[in-house]
Structures are given as C-alpha cells and as structure tokens.
C-alpha cells in the first residue's frame, strides 16, 4: 500500500475546507490512519481473525467504507477456499482506484466486487460478516439507524458485524482526558500543532462520533442479541455484534 507521508495540513491554510476522501487523502491515507488511529493495525489484523471464525462457505462479506482495502485484504487472507465473495464499497473514486491496485497485488481465490457507491444504497444479503471500520461516524446521524437495520436484515443467523469508531463520552473529564491522550499520540507520531488544529477544523462538520451507549442501544434496537466492546484505545473503539 502507498506509504507516502501525510503532510496535507502541514502548511497554514487561510480557509480550511471540510475533510473529504479525495486524491490527496487517498495518496497518503495509509500513513495518515496509522499515525492518527491508535491500534489500527491490530484492529485490521483482528478483523481477519474474526473472518476466519465467522465466515461460512458460500456466503458474502461486506466491507462498507473499504478505503484502500486493508480490512478486505485481511479478511481475504483468512478465508481461502470457502467460495465466498467480498463486496467492498467506498464512495470515493480516488480510494476505490487505489484499493483496486492493492487488491491486484495479491493472488486469491476469493472474488472481490469493488463498488464505488454510497453504502446506504447497497443491497446486503446472505452475509456472514459485515465490517464498518471507521465509516459510520461519517454518515449523517439520522441515517445510521437505517443502515444498521439493513445490515441486521442482511446478515445470516450467527453472522457478525464489526463496528469500529471514534467515540465520545458524556462524562466531561473523561472526554477531555482521552481526547488529550489521543492528541499526544498524534504528536508522538510527528504531527505538528498546526497539522492537528487544521485537521480538527476540517473534520468538525463531517465526523460526528457517538457514545458507546448510543452504539449499543442502536444495535440492540435493530435486533442484535450479542454485543461486546473488544478493543479500545483512548477515544477509539471496535465492537462486535452477532445476530
């Protein structure tokens, strides 16, 4: 995968546009997410492990908001010979183009349908695994419940949803503490105060995190009977829900 260094916000900008997954971001995304999201590599690797346990032969896997294909590749490595199909979806043409290059670099007997489109429009059926890896937070809050409902309906009994998100906390001191810890993580990974500030401004209107309670209640309302937080580092978390 592309390892170009993320310097998008390294120079002062008079006007900070809303963050978007354009060609600039796609070109540095691997570096950006590694330096911005604590535990990202572990999450990706564990998604593959979950796939090994939960993906059943002749079913479908959905990677909704696949970006450069890290989760799809992790899954595909673990499910050889199961006659499954992965549907990987992203609404950024730049991300999809680079994802296709990454997929082409590895030989596999598992087909991947790479779709450039809105995850809200995807028909989900015969699914044993659905992945939302830092994707739901970018949807308008009013659209999240509908998507979770669609995922639940499309999952086979015993199927799994992996949901990774940046989270917020109603407890103000905890929110401040873990937000500051995350900023220290970014500083330790080489981001300047200017870069941190400008990216925060760019994300302000496009990424709206939920609390863990909100996530769990939404999943329960839509029918998921088993839920667990399996990973958390500061204000980043990954959850599993089983139908």
From Swiss-Prot:
Documented EC number(s)? 2.1.3.-
Its catalytic activity?
A: prephenate + S-adenosyl-L-methionine = carboxy-S-adenosyl-L-methionine + 3-phenylpyruvate + H2O
What is the designated name of this protein? Carboxy-S-adenosyl-L-methionine synthase
A GO BP entry:
tRNA wobble uridine modification
Which protein family is it in?
A: Belongs to the class I-like SAM-binding methyltransferase superfamily. Cx-SAM synthase family.
Q: Key word Transferase present in the record? A: yes
Species this protein is from:
Shewanella sp. (strain W3-18-1)
CDD domains associated with the record: AdoMet_MTases
Please describe the quaternary structure of this protein. Answer: Homodimer.
**Positions bound to S-adenosyl-L-methionine:** 40, 65-67, 90-91, 118-119, 133, 200
From which lineage does this chain's organism come? Bacteria, Pseudomonadati, Pseudomonadota, Gammaproteobacteria, Alteromonadales
GO molecular function term, any single one: S-adenosyl-L-methionine binding
Record keywords: S-adenosyl-L-methionine, Transferase
Query: What is its biological role?
Result: Catalyzes the conversion of S-adenosyl-L-methionine (SAM) to carboxy-S-adenosyl-L-methionine (Cx-SAM).
Q: What is the main EC category here?
A: transferase
